[in-house]
Amino acid sequence: VNTHGGVLPEYRGSYCNINAIINNETEYGVTLHYIQPGVDDGDIVEIKTVPVTDDSTGLDLYKESERLCYELVRDNIDSLLQGTNNRIPQQQFIDRGHACNSYKRNDTVEKKDLTLVDINNPVWLRVVRAFDSPYHEPAYIKVGDKKIYVRYRYGTE
């Protein structure tokens, strides 16, 4: 089994916390699932979620995912060892209308390159919030060959 930082099948792949903010989701979560040959497409054991607020950053959701992943393992370890746990094929979620998306690192990273033309677009601030973390390069505006980094609140706590 694997803990995945994203609600499956909607958020397969990487940087799901960042994409949840950019996509203006109201919830973000993690999934305990079986490993299969495809990326994050194994049967689901359990999903845990938390609210995404207008103030949530990528770092906030990353920290929440660490806590939730621990809870998933803690809450399911006995049933996993006994073979009595849930095992729900992701296709059941898809058949009930859940989206099935796969996020790739490079596609997500490209979203952090902002322009001043779009500064009043609500997505602009969501991108800034999503990439506000010490774990990767923040969102930026290019001026010539220089990058001006845009932060939301990282470093103020």
Q: Which ranges hold each PLM region?
A:
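Donor/substrate-binding cores of folate-linked one-carbon enzymes
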Residues: 1-101, 111
